[in-house]
Amino acid sequence: MSNIINAIIEIVKAPKHKLKEYSTSHNRANQMGAALEDYIKDIFAGTVGECDIKVRNRKINEVFAYLGNQNNPPDSMLKDGGAAIEVKKIESPNSALALNSSYPKAKLFSGSTMISAACRDCEKWTERDMIYAVGVLNGDNLCSMAMVYGEDYCADKETYERIRGAIKTGVGQIQGIEFAETNELGRVNRVDPLGITYLRVRGMCIFLGR
């Protein structure tokens, strides 16, 4: 099973600083967020220098149980109950780190309403370590990268869920508005006279830069 030590060793063995060139050499889209996610997958799978796309895909599938989607955390999960990985890019070391509607996680739990069915069912699991992999990008240049376990940086889930629950309950008690069931903080139906517009109420969790 791959782990964060394997990833660090791979970075030392084969550092890559130009993500655009790296992504292009692997015949993949060079959008920088996607390129950083690809690089993170490769350092865990040991495929940084692998140019044969079939070999690369095979090795990645041997290491990862889940490879993510655009709408739900995490970005990937290692096999055999290994860590879940969330990849984030920032533009300077002191930038705030936006987690969007997903609150910080010390651990990832299979019962979370934020994850997809594919993530939940990829293998039998209850909870996983959470790794935040944060790359500092200047254009397509990867200036630095940090990987931190969620349990070393985040509070337990009850802390965030208590606040989220209080806000969600408060929003839902507003009178004269038609609410619908949602996993977000709220959803308001029939915002306009025609009843064809709805409003999503979402949180934005942010780690403050230092």
Task: Label each region the model flagged.
Residues 1-73, 78, 83, 89-210:
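Nucleic-acid endonuclease domains
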